[in-house]
Amino acid sequence: MAIKKYKPTTNGRRHMTSSDFAEITTSTPEKSLLRPLKKKAGRNNQGKLTVRHHGGGHKRQYRVIDFKRNKDGIPGRVATIEYDPNRSANIALINYADGEKRYIIAAKGLEVGQTIYSGAEADIKVGNALELKDIPVGTVIHNIEMKPGKGGQLVRSAGTSAQVLGKEGKYVLIRLNSGEVRMILATCRATIGQVGNEQHELINIGKAGRSRWMGKRPTVRGSVMNPNDHPHGGGEGKAPIGRKSPMSPWGKPTLGYKTRKKNNNSDKFIVRRRKKK
């Protein structure tokens, strides 16, 4: 993948960049793996706003992704590499020998025509999925399960990867992209390799309208709201916030305030905390 730049024909195009989509092999998704995706605009079942800055955007269809990778012993051939509007990573369509088709996260280096496997007998090659106890120390992995059989939950975004650091009893030590070192059950599965489309983070949106195409609504500063809408609101002109520290719209301290629950049950699995930004 390469980053495509545009001539500054307008102010919106001046710094805009996009992917050249060189890795994409087809623009037509597999129809049997599509599901309707209704827009919620950040509202819950009562119609109340629960997630800010959501709404609008281009119509999408959801691609059903196989995060479990549980087709043990059945070879699968990579048929296509496709764009997925619902995630930053690309996806790969796999045609299995028993006739089933599934989408998986496209790893870096995965190519059309390549054969992939799942299970204990699989080789340590890009795209293959194994239990963590069967993966050698030092291997780069992605799409990691947190509970056996639940499906991959960690390391699924474009360009991300984790590394196996060691094995202790029924747990395996994993270093995540954030620098956090975590213990995960050895019977959980992961996929070999780094997630593809690694230059996604270099894309410059360029203009506000492009964010709206993606379903992102504007972020309004609290200081320009009314006092009933935000703790920073009100006052005459460009007034200071009038608080000891910045506050969230719900009156909680923000910008550096720790929000992780104290005595979280998963604390015992974290060996080293993530790197500070």
Swiss-Prot record:
Gene Ontology cellular component list: large ribosomal subunit
Region ranges (Disordered): 24-55, 221-277
UniProtKB keywords: Ribonucleoprotein, Ribosomal protein, RNA-binding, rRNA-binding
The keyword Signal is annotated on this UniProt entry: no
A GO BP annotation: cytoplasmic translation
InterPro entries: NA-bd_OB-fold, Rib_uL2_dom2, Ribosomal_uL2, Ribosomal_uL2_bac/org-type, Ribosomal_uL2_C, Ribosomal_uL2_CS, Ribosomal_uL2_dom3, Ribosomal_uL2_RNA-bd_dom
Keyword RNA-binding: yes
Coiled-coil segments: none
Signal peptide: none
GO molecular function: RNA binding; rRNA binding; structural constituent of ribosome; transferase activity
Function: One of the primary rRNA binding proteins. Required for association of the 30S and 50S subunits to form the 70S ribosome, for tRNA binding and peptide bond formation. It has been suggested to have peptidyltransferase activity; this is somewhat controversial. Makes several contacts with the 16S rRNA in the 70S ribosome.
Subunit and partners: Part of the 50S ribosomal subunit. Forms a bridge to the 30S subunit in the 70S ribosome.
NCBIfam families: rplB_bact
Similarity field: Belongs to the universal ribosomal protein uL2 family.
Protein name: Large ribosomal subunit protein uL2
Species whose genome carries this gene: Listeria monocytogenes serovar 1/2a (strain ATCC BAA-679 / EGD-e)
